[in-house]
Swiss-Prot record:
One of its GO terms (biological process) is serine import into mitochondrion. GO terms for cellular component: mitochondrial inner membrane; mitochondrion. It comes from the Eukaryota. Amino acid transporter importing serine, an essential substrate of the mitochondrial branch of the one-carbon pathway, into mitochondria. Mitochondrial serine is then converted to glycine and formate, which exits to the cytosol where it is used to generate the charged folates that serve as one-carbon donors. May also transport other amino acids including alanine and cysteine. PANTHER family: SIDEROFLEXIN (PTHR11153), SIDEROFLEXIN-1 (PTHR11153:SF8). Belongs to the sideroflexin family. It comes from Rattus norvegicus (Rat). This is Sideroflexin-1.
Amino acid sequence: MSGEVPPNINIKEPRWDQSTFIGRASHFFTVTDPKNILLTNEQLENARKVVHDYRQGIVPAGLTENELWRAKYAYDSAFHPDTGEKMTLIGRMSAQVPMNMTITGCMMTFYRTTPAVLFWQWINQSFNAVVNYTNRSGDAPLTVNELGTAYVSATTGAVATALGLNALTKHVSPLIGRFVPFAAVAAANCINIPLMRQRELKVGIPVTDENGTRLGESTNAAKQAITQVVISRILMAAPGMAIPPFIMNTLEKKAFLKRFPWMSAPIQVTLVGFCLVFATPLCCALFPQKSSMSVTSLEDDLQASIQKSHPELRRVYFNKGL
């Protein structure tokens, strides 16, 4: 539809049906589009104004439905869904593909020596710390100590895993050695994400009814949200870290790379990038962004409170984070 926009579109929700995987994938292909990181501050502020005005019933003359949705997705790409704060540039989901293809490609090219492992795992976990904090659920702030603990623990876990597996794989096929970075990344995700979101595990994340009315905070919802994010992140990294090793193992035996060994890194980065263009939105779409759980799965005191104020309510909803 390209005519003037009707006044009753619910732009608090994505454009596509989020109850289906295809709908969620369409949504995240738009949210993770790397072109969004090229938007200027002026364009983002204009998008925010369009979205906020429309929510208040103010429709600028000449605004079309497609323009409204473009503004909504520009807004969603840069502003946190719970706090409304502008997110750090490299922490936005639209930066995932360019940042991860560079870091992952280098991790998988320079994995044979201890200094290289230390450096690239440190770079990767520094980036992950920014992403995990930027895309946390809810509005609970982390202290400097909590941030530091999460960052140091994840970096230590990733480096220890990588170095330990490097030592174990010295006497096996070089192909197996190429999978060490993936094992390190998977281990680090299991450490970094829960620690970076530890306050949610302590105090809970906001849960609402289907209309967005806040009902309280739930640690059980936080556990479900964080588990889903860990699974998504590991699977997101898998294609880019599992497919290129087979290709590179074959290419490095060819005359071309023997003659031009410096081409190994750019080829690896390109292969990883191609995988991530598809893996990032598809794995974000595995679970609904607006996740839900049964009221009976909540903590006893929150259950009692909800049953008292909303006796007919059966499910609650929450932002799982990304």
